[in-house]
């Protein structure tokens, strides 16, 4: 697989920073981990995924290897080489494992699919210019275009 391009890295960096800043300002307990960071969804030692960004609120899931169990919020940044996996296999895996919120950020179409997995539905599809309400945080709105300025 090809390494992520510059825009992918910029989106990953600015999103992680924005979420981390919000958590710190609000004295939150969740932790933000950009890739590379192993997530063992089935709590075994063999099978893991590396989401572009993982937000974990239950610190008992964290150990030296990464996260054992489902993160609360996962963000994947789609590319031509990962699109099929991000929209198919990973959506199924994250839903089955108990991830609460899943975002697929697509730099090619400049859209963000937000899945509220507790409601088991696609909440909405947004453009980079939209203010996107985060499902797990009532007071957090993210605008990708603003982050990329």
Predicted regions and their residues:
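Gly/Pro/Ser/Thr-rich low-complexity, intrinsically disordered segments predominantly at protein N-termini
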Residues: 1-149
